[in-house]
UniProtKB/Swiss-Prot annotation:
Gene3D superfamilies: UbiA prenyltransferase
Domain of life: Bacteria
Compartments it resides in: Cell membrane
Gene Ontology terms: cellular component: plasma membrane
Entry keyword annotation includes Cell membrane: yes
CDD domains, sorted: PT_UbiA_2
Protein name: Nodulation protein NoeC
Gene: noeC
Species, as recorded: Azorhizobium caulinodans (strain ATCC 43989 / DSM 5975 / JCM 20966 / LMG 6465 / NBRC 14845 / NCIMB 13405 / ORS 571)
Bilayer topology annotation: Multi-pass membrane protein
Length: 307
């Protein structure tokens, strides 16, 4: 039962850990529509930041729900067993309350952003619950649902900023996140095979699926690069020899990063989460820096052409 005295003994950081605030970086996807359209001035829009807060809150609620339902499997995992609910630092009842409060708080923020964003947020929560409850145990389907959840963030950002997103970029996003999700699965399978484990706990994959998952990583990743190139060719941001060259170079950088990530995952050298890998791996940071500089250059070129 809930007890205030008992709850007071739980360190505040334990609650924070359960919310996984480091994953809020993924909600930076809400700002992507503004950036790809070269409208940096719209980054200061209040609705956009309110949408960011919305997804931080609901995403944390879903992570809590995920950890609650995955406690049994996490306790058998070498690293996940240290999570707050798996290690029994937080009780199941505490997790239920945290989940409800976080999702409700996100819903309140979404309502203040308008009906369309509320509908997108509600769809995100519903799809997330379906994923946690059923789909994460289904092989391949889980990759596409995860991709849809990430792409929903981009749609939410476009809605909050009132910016249309080209279909070619949405196709790039969908395939890129299928690739990233499969890279994570590939890395997990490699590590389990190395440890002699029989299967991937709580997921629908077997060790014998290792090669086919690697194939999905590569094919989806390169398909994403093709859609990115299509977006570049159709985009008004890349006009003139220099911007077009920079845009194509950015496509090459993305292709290189995906290829390298697949090799790292195939070796089992990647961290369990691709986000941690992207922000800690030296080559990945160089790629991110290069892409950021290229994006700044394209926005500058667009501002000069408008001026």
């Amino acid at each position: 039962m809930w007890n205030k005295e008992w709850a007071a003994k739980i360190p505040f950081m334990t609650y924070c850990e359960a919310c996984r605030p480091h994953h809020w970086l993924k909600n930076g996807l809400l700002f992507v529509p503004v950036l790809i359209c070269g409208r940096a001035e719209d980054l200061l829009q209040a609705p956009l930041w309110l949408a960011f807060m919305t997804f931080c809150s609901v995403a944390s609620g879903i992570y809590v729900l995920n950890d609650l339902m995955d406690r049994a499997h996490d306790r058998r995992h070498p690293s996940k067993r240290h999570r707050p609910f798996a290690s029994r630092k937080l009780s199941g009842l505490t997790g239920v309350w945290m989940c409800l409060v976080l999702i409700a708080l996100g819903g309140v923020c979404a309502i203040n952003c308008g009906e369309r964003l509320f509908a997108i947020t509600a769809s995100y929560v519903a799809l997330s619950v379906i994923y946690v409850g059923k789909v994460r145990g289904e092989y391949v389907l889980d990759l596409f649902v995860l991709s849809a959840l990430y792409t929903t963030r981009i749609l939410a950002g476009a809605t909050a900023a009132n910016i249309p997103v080209p279909a070619s970029f949405l196709a790039f996003s969908a395939m890129a996140f299928v690739s990233l999700a499969s890279i994570k699965r590939l890395n997990e399978l490699t590590q389990l095979r190395r440890d002699g484990a029989p299967d991937l706990y709580g997921r629908g994959y077997e060790l014998s699926d290792h090669s086919i998952v690697a194939l999905i990583c590569v094919s989806a990743g390169y398909a994403a690069v093709v859609f990115l190139e299509l977006f570049v060719q159709m985009s008004s941001v890349a006009q003139g020899p220099a911007p077009i060259f920079v845009s194509n170079a950015m496509c090459v950088v993305v292709a290189y990063w995906i290829s390298r990530a697949v090799v790292q995952a195939h070796r089992g050298d990647m961290r369990s989460d691709t986000l941690c890998y992207a922000v800690t791996d030296g080559s990945s940071l160089v790629c991110i820096l290069g892409l950021a500089l290229g994006l700044v250059f394209l926005m500058y070129c667009r501002s000069q052409s408008i001026g």
